[in-house]
């Protein structure tokens, strides 16, 4: 909002009130053999209004195409790799991305 007179103009920016922020990070659980299913928690997020969550699984810091659910089934291509899930919390005020713990290496 800008206000002023002939000599001065004052400008303020609205604060990004209510944007999500992480209180505790997400955690992956499961066993590390091909065919097993890993599951991630959302972690704990403070957000008002409430946040919605999305997921992106990664192997060795590289995105796994199509792996965007809160569960992931390990495949042969994961052998030897470290698996992480990035959980995004989004609301009308903003978004935060938080990486989970890494699990690995994946075995056959």
What are these regions (language model features)?
Residues 1-11:
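Short, intrinsically disordered N-terminal pre-domain segments
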């Amino acid at each position: 909002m800008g206000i002023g007179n002939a000599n001065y103009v004052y400008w303020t920016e609205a604060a990004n009130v209510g944007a999500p922020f992480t209180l505790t990070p997400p955690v992956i659980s499961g066993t590390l053999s091909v065919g097993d299913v890993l599951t991630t928690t959302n972690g704990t997020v403070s957000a008002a209004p409430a946040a919605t969550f999305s997921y992106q699984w990664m192997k060795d810091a590289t995105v796994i195409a199509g792996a965007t659910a809160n569960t992931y089934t390990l495949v042969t291509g994961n052998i030897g790799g470290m698996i992480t899930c990035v959980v995004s919390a989004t609301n009308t005020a903003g978004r935060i991305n938080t990486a989970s713990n890494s699990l690995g290496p994946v075995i056959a």
